[in-house]
């Protein structure tokens, strides 16, 4: 038997098996019947590799060996289970190359080693994207994402405009502690003028001069993930005015408020504001805010507290970023339509489908159908099946004539031939989405449940003037 153990030691070293413990744990050897002691395991001080015919924690149990014609008995190298961390022991007649007994351990996700004794460090594979910080856990990992990203691997971007500038957020959703009145009350700098890049003589919100604790508030109408804010000043009577610094508060009911604080402290965060009246300045929230109401409290102002702004973020579920109509990521050839209108029947005034991009500028800046009927459609080919969670629509003007789609349906397909119309789950019929009421304001609709498809069609159902459309699709390219 001594010669057999010595031979095992020699062969084991040449094959690269785990080294035997040299400390007090394995010296003297606690394994009986020629068992080999292994130390350095995750959840036990040592483990015994038992020779054929023996089993148990110390190789003290005799195994009943079956003949070639018989099926193995219930006793064997897998009783008791030598595998750690929930590993499954399987009897193996094949020579495995790293041990001398007839079994292998099938390890659960997150563990490896001969006996599943090692916790895998998943962070070594760098699963967290977009600057996320990985923390290794037992058989798992977690990603701490920057404010503008979310998802298990920080794979979803969450920094789109929430609609102050575009008009998705209505006037009624923007309120303030006070309003400045000038020129004997003829000029009123209302809170709903606080829209980023707003033009005109009165183009921002200004707090009243006697307002000692001014604030402006946005009601998002539902709980959303807010990851940042863009601020901008304005000129009033030729004089630059802007907010140099501010604080942020948030609430879910509009009554109980919490101040945004420096991460890991009880100190209220003071955000840097603007340095002139026109240049936008952005701040991100890490961690992000999850709330329905957001308030901005000016701290230091130049002359008067004057503001234009936009909130950034996404729906709580994420996956609500623009898919590329406005940015051009969706290319011209991917956008097609049922028909096209030409003003004065001139090619230079052709309202092609490729022009149906949100906020497109120019004299011919949208898609207009050649016919005004409910058989018209605008189609976007996303090239691969994509999760679509929302849509933004906008009208346009044709030589001063206001035109827009007042309502529409959505259809989707994966092959471009067989189509399904998105259904209203409660009423069990085709969903009719509310469209626009003018030529310029953005109108956003959430698609719930989301559509998962390659092709999307907008089916105009009612319209003003001619069927005219600019649009953006919202969603994400993957679902992990």
Curated annotation (Swiss-Prot):
Its main location: secreted. InterPro entries: EGF-like_Ca-bd_dom, EGF-like_CS, EGF-like_dom, EGF-type_Asp/Asn_hydroxyl_site, EGF_Ca-bd_CS, FA58C, Galactose-bd-like_sf, Neuropilin_MCO_CoagFactor. Disulfide bonds join 26-37, 31-48, 50-59, 78-89, 83-105, 107-116, 123-134, 128-143, 145-154, 158-314, 301-305, 319-476. GO terms for cellular component: extracellular region. CDD domains: EGF_CA, FA58C. Ca(2+) binds at residues 119-120, 122, 136-137. Residues 24-60, 74-117, 119-155 form the EGF-like domain. Residues 158-314, 319-476 form the F5/8 type C domain. Expressed in angioblasts and early endothelial cells. By embryonic day 13.5, also expressed in a restricted group of non-endothelial cells including chondrocytes and retinal neurons. A motif (Cell attachment site) lies at residues 96-98. Promotes adhesion of endothelial cells through interaction with the alpha-v/beta-3 integrin receptor. Inhibits formation of vascular-like structures. May be involved in regulation of vascular morphogenesis of remodeling in embryonic development. This is EGF-like repeat and discoidin I-like domain-containing protein 3. It comes from Mus musculus (Mouse). The lineage of its organism: Eukaryota, Metazoa, Chordata, Craniata, Vertebrata.
